[in-house]
């Protein structure tokens, strides 16, 4: 199924862990909107979502890294390998060693926490080892000066993605 959370409570009319329910039970639930209001929509399988999105949008599969071998099989089956973004905060050498076979077939976007003391080294590793088209950064406070350093380090090499869904990811700012 396509589910962001490990629990059903926030995004569906169900309760409890996703892993504790059958596919039939989950398919019977309804999705909730951002205000937690029940909608008419059902929980799709990943395959259904890929087919629906095919040719329309890119999909950010930010929770799929640990299952990417399985996910990739679906991407090939649905012809959507060029429509997804695979993300991870794993070290660049680990990504290259374990997922290198996918890096020319899908967009890979590393995630780097700029509050980490090794952030710039991690960025350099990614730029040297993987050469991503973009990098997602997060940082907790505007007092962090690394967003300025990142801009210079990445100029002409890769795009910058700041996730502004929560203020804890973008220096206290959100959408």
For the regions a language model picked out, list residue spans one by one.
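Active-site-adjacent beta->alpha loops and helix N-cap segments on the catalytic face
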Residues: 67-69, 90-97, 142-153
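Acidic, His- and aromatic-enriched active-site or binding-groove loops in soluble protein domains
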Residues: 13-16, 80-91
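Hydrophobic faces of well-ordered beta-strands that scaffold small-molecule active sites
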Residues: 59-61, 84-87, 104-111, 135-137, ...
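Distinct, well-ordered alpha-helical segments
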Residues: 67-78, 92-103, 116-127
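C-terminal active-site rim and adjoining tail of enzyme catalytic domains
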Residues: 117-175
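Structural recognition of alpha->loop->beta junctions
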Residues: 78-86, 101-106, 125-134, 174-175
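An active-site metal/cofactor-coordinating segment within enzyme catalytic domains
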Residues: 1-55
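Active-site beta-loop-alpha junctions enriched in small/polar residues
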Residues: 5-6, 29-31, 64-66, 89-91, ...
């Amino acid at each position: 199924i396509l589910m962001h959370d490990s629990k059903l409570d926030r995004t569906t009319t169900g309760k409890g862990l996703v892993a504790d329910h059958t596919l039939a039970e989950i398919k019977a639930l309804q999705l909730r909107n951002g205000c937690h209001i029940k909608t008419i929509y059902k929980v799709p399988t990943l395959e259904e979502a890929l087919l629906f999105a095919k040719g329309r949008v890119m999909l950010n599969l930010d929770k799929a890294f640990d299952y990417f071998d399985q996910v990739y099989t679906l991407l090939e089956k649905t012809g959507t390998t060029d429509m997804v973004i695979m993300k991870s905060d794993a070290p660049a050498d680990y990504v290259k060693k374990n997922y290198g076979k996918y890096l020319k077939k899908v967009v890979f976007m590393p995630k780097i926490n700029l509050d980490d003391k090794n952030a710039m080294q991690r960025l350099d590793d990614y730029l040297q080892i993987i050469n991503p088209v973009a990098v997602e950064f997060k940082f907790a406070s505007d007092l962090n000066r690394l967003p300025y350093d990142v801009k210079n380090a990445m100029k002409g090499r890769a795009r910058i993605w700041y996730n502004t869904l929560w203020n804890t990811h973008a220096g206290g700012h959100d959408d």
